[in-house]
Amino acid sequence: MQHEPNGHPTLAHRPRRNDLHHLDVYRCALELYRKVGQIVAQFPRGEADLRSQMRRASRSVPFNIGEGVGKRGKARAAAYEVALGEAKELIVALDCVEIDQLAPQGELFAAQNLADRVAAMLTKLIRSAEAHSL
C-alpha cells in the first residue's frame, strides 16, 4: 500500500467509502486542488486575495461534486453546476496568474489543463443528471 508523506494511505489506495471515490471527476478535482495549492504557495505577499480566492474555488469544486453524488435528478445537476461555476472561476484565475507571471509555466499549464478537463467532465455529468430527471 502506498502512503503519503504524513503516513496516511494515498487516496488511490484507501478503501472506497462510497460512489464518490469511483468518480474520475472527483479524483481530478482533488488533484486540481493539490496543484492549485502548490501554485498559490509561491505567490508573493501582495497576492493574498488571489491566493485566498483560488484556494476557495479549488476547494469548492470537490465539495460540490461530493454534494451532488448524494442527490438525484435536478438537485444533483444543480450541485454539479455550482462545481462547474467554481471550476470556470478557477480557469479565469489561472489565466490571471499566467498574465501576471506568478507561477512557473509548467505547473500553471498542468493546472490549466486539469481545470479544463474537470470542467468538461462536469458539463457531461450535468447533462446526464438533467436527462435522468425528466
Predicted regions and their residues:
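Amphipathic alpha-helical assembly/interaction segments
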Residues: M1-L134
